[in-house]
């Protein structure tokens, strides 16, 4: 998932480590992911059987950031394509994201699918699952026999998307011919926070999709897109597959359903201090924590998870019983480990990404607890995933607890707080560096959820990005200004 405005590129080592995703695995080791809530896990479970031989090549995913380096793309893509070269496969499945922009190619997944098609030929079906935030391109649609997107955000149905992809592949193998395909592109960009399927209008949109799919006997997908990739095919797409040309009408109807509700996709945001003041007022009469999304520094959208705007707001507002995480600062984590728990350290925390309006936070912090950064997710988003955030620590400043780590991980699972000794259920205010994924595990314990617009590389309002290459006429937000080529 490429944020072309983000400060840090994505290199090969980022894919090796994984971070937001499991670490890179090859060959038979891929099959061990069958029980993880990701598409490849659902696909494996759905395809297993005495008459099916699964031949995995490689699986790798990197925490979202800026452009994927050419070296990383070419090394990993070559492994995938070479694994299919000269083999007599019946079908090919890819677990993709769908919003990769490389240094040398705007459409990483399209390039990979096209290269695979050139190797396996026109008769071997290629099916891929995509993230809900995919920027679906013409090349992707033309190179694959079927693309299947998630339907939930937070992405609780990742494995289900893999199962749906397996079902389509089985049907393609049985019928021996491609389905009719139709696709429509939305005329406006949707803010990331507006895509949450736990609330309207996204919840109703995916309900309408499921009803149309069932009633018409077709396969439908809607990817609202990732509105932080500056290239002409950025944005939402509705597409589907059917036995005949009727699929054109089904796709057109769902697109009209979405566009007719354009005003509902508008999202309100709070300034940092305003968000903290509201949280304090709510928390004063609540028994559960108020959760604030520090959405513009979401590492799941290209942020480095080290901006300090929300920390400053918590301190300035003298918040009590507050926690913020993850603050990614390897130097601060090392200083905490060198000093030891119970000691004070005077450091410049975070603010290292050169984001406009952001700067390091200079203060003397108390080291409350140290951690090796190991965490196993128990929440519904990626239940069972193990992550290693590197040397980590819980620092305190007044009534604020700061969970500092060495490596990036989106604060989407309560155990990321617990690994540093914060019990999230006992806090009054939680500030999560996340946009929506945190809701899967935190909404059940939250008195209220607020969205703050502190400085960060993932602009919550797409119209705030300095676009140069969007499709002419694209509205930069729902009911917003129209993009004009500079």
Give the positions of each predicted feature.
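Conserved anion/nucleotide-ligand pocket segment
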Residues: 162, 170-210
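Active-site histidine-anchored catalytic micro-motif
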Residues: 3-6, 70-77, 84-177, 289, ...
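Glycine-rich phosphate/diphosphate-binding loops that line cofactor/substrate pockets in enzymes
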Residues: 48-52, 56, 82-92, 276-290
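N-terminal amphipathic/basic leader segments beginning at the initiator methionine
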Residues: 1-49
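Charged, often glycine-rich, active-site loop that binds/positions anionic groups
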Residues: 59-79
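Extended hydrophobic packing segments that form well-structured cores
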Residues: 259, 376-486
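Short acidic, glycine/serine/threonine-rich loops at helix termini
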Residues: 6-10, 66-69, 104-106, 137-142, ...
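Hard-cation-handling environments
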Residues: 193-399, 403, 407
């Amino acid at each position: 998932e490429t944020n072309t405005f983000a400060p840090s590129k994505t290199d090969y080592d980022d894919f090796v480590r994984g971070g937001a995703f499991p670490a890179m695995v090859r060959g038979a080791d891929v099959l061990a992911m069958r029980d993880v809530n990701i598409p490849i896990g659902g696909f494996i479970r759905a395809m297993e059987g005495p008459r099916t031989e699964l031949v995995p090549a490689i699986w790798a995913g990197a925490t979202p950031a800026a452009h994927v380096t050419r070296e990383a793309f070419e090394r990993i893509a070559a492994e995938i394509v070479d694994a299919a070269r000269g083999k007599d496969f019946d079908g090919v499945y890819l677990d993709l994201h769908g919003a990769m922009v490389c240094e040398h190619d705007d459409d990483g997944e399209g390039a990979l699918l096209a290269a695979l098609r050139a190797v396996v030929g026109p008769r071997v079906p290629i099916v891929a699952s995509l993230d809900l935030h995919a920027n679906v391109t013409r090349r992707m649609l033309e190179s694959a026999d079927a693309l299947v997107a998630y339907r939930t955000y937070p992405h609780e149905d990742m494995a289900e998307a893999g199962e749906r992809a397996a079902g389509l592949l089985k049907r393609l193998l049985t019928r021996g011919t491609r389905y009719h395909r139709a696709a429509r592109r939305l005329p406006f960009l949707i803010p990331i926070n507006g895509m949450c399927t736990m609330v309207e209008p996204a919840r109703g949109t995916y309900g309408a999709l499921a009803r149309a799919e069932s009633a018409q006997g077709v396969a439908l997908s809607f990817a609202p897109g990732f509105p932080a990739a500056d290239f002409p095919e950025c944005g939402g797409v509705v597409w589907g597959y059917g036995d005949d040309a009727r699929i054109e009408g089904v796709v057109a109807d769902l697109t009209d359903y979405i566009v007719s509700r354009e005003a509902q996709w508008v999202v309100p945001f709070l300034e940092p201090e305003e968000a903290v003041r509201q949280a304090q007022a709510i928390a004063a009469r609540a028994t559960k924590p108020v959760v604030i999304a520090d959405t513009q520094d979401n590492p799941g959208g290209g942020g480095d998870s080290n901006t300090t705007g929300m920390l400053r707001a918590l301190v300035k507002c003298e918040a009590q019983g507050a926690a913020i995480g993850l603050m990614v600062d390897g130097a601060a984590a090392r200083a905490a480990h060198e000093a030891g728990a119970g000691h004070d350290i005077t450091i410049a925390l975070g603010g290292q990404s050169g984001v406009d309006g952001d700067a390091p936070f200079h203060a003397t912090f108390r080291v409350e607890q140290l951690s090796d950064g190991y965490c196993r997710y128990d929440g519904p988003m990626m239940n069972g995933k193990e992550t290693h955030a590197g040397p980590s620590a819980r620092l305190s400043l007044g009534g604020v607890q700061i969970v500092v780590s060495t490596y990036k991980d989106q604060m989407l699972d309560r155990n990321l707080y617990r690994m540093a000794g914060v019990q999230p259920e006992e806090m009054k205010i939680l500030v999560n560096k996340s946009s929506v994924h945190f809701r899967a595990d935190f909404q059940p314990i939250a008195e209220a959820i607020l969205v703050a617009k502190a400085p960060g590389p993932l602009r919550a309002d797409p119209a705030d990005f300095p676009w140069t290459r969007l499709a002419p006429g694209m509205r930069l937000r729902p009911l917003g200004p129209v993009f004009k080529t500079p």
